[in-house]
UniProtKB/Swiss-Prot annotation:
Residues 11-176 form the PPIase cyclophilin-type domain. It comes from Mus musculus (Mouse). This is Peptidyl-prolyl cis-trans isomerase G. Residues 182-752 are annotated as: Disordered. SUPFAM superfamilies: Cyclophilin-like. One of its GO terms (cellular component) is cytosol. The gene is Ppig. It catalyses: [protein]-peptidylproline (omega=180) = [protein]-peptidylproline (omega=0).
Amino acid sequence: MGIKVQRPRCFFDIAINNQPAGRVVFELFSDVCPKTCENFRCLCTGEKGTGKSTQKPLHYKSCLFHRVVKDFMVQGGDFSEGNGRGGESIYGGFFEDESFAVKHNKEFLLSMANRGKDTNGSQFFITTKPTPHLDGHHVVFGQVISGQEVVREIENQKTDAASKPFAEVRILSCGELIPKSKVKKEEKKRHKSSSSSSSSDSDSSSDSQSSSESSDSESASEEKSRKRKKKHRKNSRKHKKEKKKRKKSKKSPSSESEAENVDAQPQSTVRPEEIPPIPENRFLMRKSPPKADDKERKNRERERERECNPPNSQPASYQRRFLVTRSGRKIKGRGPRRYRTPSRSRSRDRFRRSETPPHWRQEMQRAQRMRVSSGERWIKGDKSELNEIKENQRSPVRVKEKKITDHRHMSESPNRKVEKEKKAKDHKSESKERDIRRNSEKDDKYNKNKVKKRGKSKSRSKSKERSKSKERDSKHSRHEDKRVRSRSKERDHETTKEKEKPLDPKGKDQERSRSKENSKQVESKSNEHDHSKSKEKDRRAQSRSRERDLTKSKHSYNSRTRERSRSRDRSRRVRSRSHDRDRSRSKEYHRYREQEYRRRGRSRSRDRRTPGRSRSKDRRRRRRDSRSSEREESQSRNKDKYRSQESKSSHRKENSEGEKRTYSKSRDHNSSSNNREKKADREQSPVSKTKQSSQDNEVKSSTLKNQEDEKTRSPVEKENQKSKGQENDHVHDKNKKCDHESSPGTDEDKSG
C-alpha cells in the first residue's frame, strides 16, 4: 500500500483599485508536473531572490492582472513590465513544456501562458470556461479551490481595445498554505504514546503486588495479554478493510456525479479565432525576424501573380492608368501631361511644327494681348500724323488749346516759319523713337514743352539770322546774290506746288529729303566761297565800281518785279493755309458736336430715370456752349484787330523806307569818291535789301487782301453773326436766370 502525498496549495490576496476583493486559493498538481508547480510556488513565496535577466525580485507580490477576456480567461504574472511582455522563471529565462496530460475540460483551471513551444516563464492564466482548443499548447498545473467569485469579479471588469482592464487589479500578497492535518496526526501520536506509557506503569505496579502470588497466575496473565493483542490486530485489520470499502463506495458515486457535472457544464461560447493574440516579447530587437509562415505566404502569392500575368503583360490596375497618345505611345507616371507627340495628320493639329508646350503658348498669347496695338505701321517721318490721330481722340479741351497755338502761328512772319520748319525737322528726326515709345499721357506733356521750345527758338533764330546776314553781306558778291535768288525762287515754287497738293506720308519724306539736300548744298557752297573770297577780292573791287552805275537801274526794276511776284505767291500761301486751318477747325468742331449729340442721346435715357440730374447736365452744356461761342467771337475780334494793326505798321514802314531810299539815292548821285560807295555797299548788301523789300511787299499784299475779303463779305453773313451772338447772349441770360431761380443743387452742379 503506497502512502497518499498531499498536494501543495498557494493563495492570492487580490485588490481592485486598491480595495481588497478577496482571497483565491490554488491547488497545484505537483504529482503531474512538479517542475512547473515548484516554479509557481517559489514565485508565490518569493524565496528565490532576483531574476538573472530582469534583475527584479522573483515574486508575484504587487503584480497586475494585465489581460482580461470575458468568457475565456484572466491573465497575470508579468512582475517585470506588467503588460505581458516581461516575466522570468526561477530557472532563468524560459523552461520547456512539462506535460499536457491534464486537459482544459473545466473552468477555474490554472495554466501556463507562453509565446510558443517551450517558452514558459512566470505568466499564468485562470480559465473561466472550458477551453479544449488550448490542449496541447499550454500546460495545466493547478486549479482554484476557493475564491471563484473573486475570479468572476475580475472577469467582469471593463477593458480597452487591448483587453487591458481600466481598473487596477493587483495581487496585494501571496504565499503557500501548509495543511493542518499533519499537526493533528502528530498530536494524536503523542497522545497515544503517553497513554501506552501510563498503562505500562499500572501493569508494573500490579505485578509487584502480585509477585507473591504463584507463577501460574503470571503465565495465565501473559497468555491473556497475548490473546488481547491478537484480537486487537484482527479488529484493526477489519476496520481498515471496512474503511477501504466505504471509501471505494464513496468514490464511485462521486466520480459518476463528476462525470455528469462535466457533461452538464456549459462550454465556452468564445471561438479560438476571436481570441486576441498574445503580445510577443521583443525586448531589445529592433526588427523582429520574419516568420517562416509569412515567407511561405509571400512566395505563394508571387507564384500566383506570375501564373496569372505572363512576363510581358502588365497588371490590370496599372493598365487602366496608362494613357495612349495619338501617335500610339503609352504615357506612364502621374500628374498632368506637359508634352505630347505631334499628330501625324496636318489637319488635326494646328501647332504641328511648334515645339513649345501648350501652357507656354498660352502665356505668350496673354503677354501679346497686353501689348499696345499701334494701329497702322509707322513710316519714317510720320510723327505728325500719329500726333493728329491722338489729338483727335482726346477731349475738346485739347482742341481749344490747339486753336490758341494756331493763332500764335498765324501772327508770325512766313520767313521765320520756314526757318522754324527746318529746325523742327532736325528735332523730329532725333525724337522719332522716343515719341513712339511714349504713351498718350506723355504726349500731352511733350506738346506743352514743344510750345515753350518754339518761343525760345524764335529768339535764337532771330539773333542767328542777324549775325549771318551781316557776315554774308560783307562777304558775298553780286554774282553770288544772283545765284542765291535763282535758287530761292525755285524753292519757293516747289514749296507752293507741294503745299497745294494733298500731303501724303511719301511726299513728306521727299520734302524733308529735298530740304536736307538743299541745306547741304548751301553749306558746301558757302565753304567754297569763303576759300575763294580772299583771292577774288582784288579783282571784284575794281569791277564793282564800273558795274554799279550800269546795274543800279536794272536792279531796281528787277527787284520790284520779283518782289511783286513773291508777294503774290506768299499771299496765296497765306490764304491756302488759312483755308486749311478753317477747314480743320470746322472738322474738329463738327466732331466735337457729334460727340456731344451722342452723349446727349445716351444721357436722355438716363434723364428719364433721373430728371434732377438731367437738368443740371443741360445747364452745364448750355454754359459750355455759351462760353465756347464767346471765346470764338473774342478770338475773331482779336484777329481783326491784329490784322488792322499789321496793316498800319506796314504802311508806316513803307513810308519810312521810301524816304530812306530817296535820301540814299540823292547821296549816291552827289558822292564822287569810290570809298563812300564801298562803305554804302558794306552797310547795305543787295541780299538784305531784297529780303526787306520782299517782306514789305508780302505784308502789304496780305493786308490788302484781308481788307478786300472783309469788304466782300456779304451783309447776310454779318447779320447771321449778329443774330447768333444775340441768341447766345439770350441763352446765357436764361441760364443765369435759371441758376438764380433753381433750388441749391449738389456740389457737382455748383462746380459745373
